[in-house]
Amino acid sequence: MSNINHAGKLGKECYTATATCLLCPQHCQLRQGQSGRCHARKNYEGEIESLTYGEVAAWNLDPIEKKPLYHFYPGSSIFSAGGFGCNLSCSFCQNHEISQKHQVGRKVTPAELAEMALEAQKSIGLCFTYSEPSMWFEMIRDTAPLVRAQGGKVVLVSNGTISPRFLEALIPWVDAVNIDIKAFSEAFYQHYCGGKLAWVLDNVEPSGGQGPLGDYNAYHPRGQ
């Protein structure tokens, strides 16, 4: 299975042997063969390649409230899966073993992942979580329609650090989103997360009722 994004939609060539990844606002400028700060993408001959397409780092059947979503099919369970990599580097990350490095995960196709989610006992669908799901953009793009076609629900649990146009590309295939706001402080985001609050807030503007159910979770780690 090829991991290469042949369409080149996630990056652009900006000068000789260097490409800029456009998937998130970090806009990593990568030399040939260099990986981004997310550990999930690299420059392959001037285009941005996904290193984690078809690799599952973790999966489980979780209560929907664990996402946490409290107004979306309360009391139900949802099959949850995630790949490797994250575009933030939160010092308090609970899933740092999969978010801060790329290892070899279980190989699955989008069809296989959709089947796992739909066949899990009492699962209402598939939640992309554990690491940052937007780093798994192509896998979500190819898997979510298969889940929805069988009547399943699709959920994202995200840090909100994704370029708005790529989030908009996923929204038609998503039923609910939880954006985890780490703190309402630019200084906190820069010091503890390696990101910017402004990037997140760009993605939590009201959708005017046209998008999926949104939930926003503010998390402030103790002592920081």
Give, region by region, the residue ranges found by the protein language model:
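Flexible, acidic/Gly-rich N-terminal and inter-domain linker regions that tether
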Residues: 1-76
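Generic secondary-structure signature for well-ordered alpha-helical cores
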Residues: 26-29, 33, 43, 91, ...
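Conserved Radical SAM active-site core
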Residues: 42-176, 185
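Internal, well-ordered alpha-helical scaffold/interface segments
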Residues: 138, 168, 198-205, 214
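Cell-envelope and extracellular/periplasmic
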Residues: 182
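Conserved strand-turn element in the central/C-terminal portion of the radical SAM core barrel
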Residues: 186-192, 204-224
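Alpha-helix N-cap and loop-to-helix initiation/capping positions
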Residues: 191-199
